[in-house]
Amino acid sequence: MGEKELLVKAQEGNKHAMNILLQNNYKALFGFTLKMTASMHLTEDIVQEVCLRAVINIKKFKGNSQFQSWLISIAINYYKDLLRKNKNIEYVGQEELYNLPNDNGENIFNKLQVQEVLQELNKLPYEKRISFILKHYYGYTYEEISKILGCSQGTTKSRIFYTISNLKKKLIGSEVQ
């Protein structure tokens, strides 16, 4: 059964269909949220809340985007709310960086490079970080990112360009020293 059929059934109240939708998108949602927050504990809390909100609000899903994009939008909005309410949210610690899941079978060198990038990403404002992650880790188009974040394509492109420039400066600059 395809995603559209599952969505129709879930919106009709079929719990099994909703469970399948969440299972099919869990890994991507968890990975995105971990990259966004760089905190395993915060990620677990956010993903749990996103799944709950998705179940409660499934009838509000219009189908204008993929279900995964909708889940990511919920995660982003919830994270924004957390940042607004709690200015003291802890970002990644070294121990969490080195324990990031290695789900792509990367060798240790690539894993360290990814962790270095994630470390630098977490120093940036969340709008820039999220735009970059959606584009370069998940392959979303500028148009899709703009819809998810509720901003113009120009703003999305600018955020990604800024992030790339900043990462190049930080990562290449640290290799030279």
Please report, for each region that a protein language model flagged, where it lies by residue.
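Sigma70-family region 2
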Residues: 11-12, 51-66, 86
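A short pre-motif secondary-structure segment
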Residues: 131-135
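Short, charged helix-capping/linker segments at alpha-helix termini
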Residues: 11-20, 30-49, 153, 175-177
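N-terminal module of bacterial RNA polymerase sigma factors
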Residues: 1-28, 122, 144, 148, ...
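Arg/Lys-rich amphipathic alpha helix in sigma70-family domain 2
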Residues: 59-62, 73-93, 162
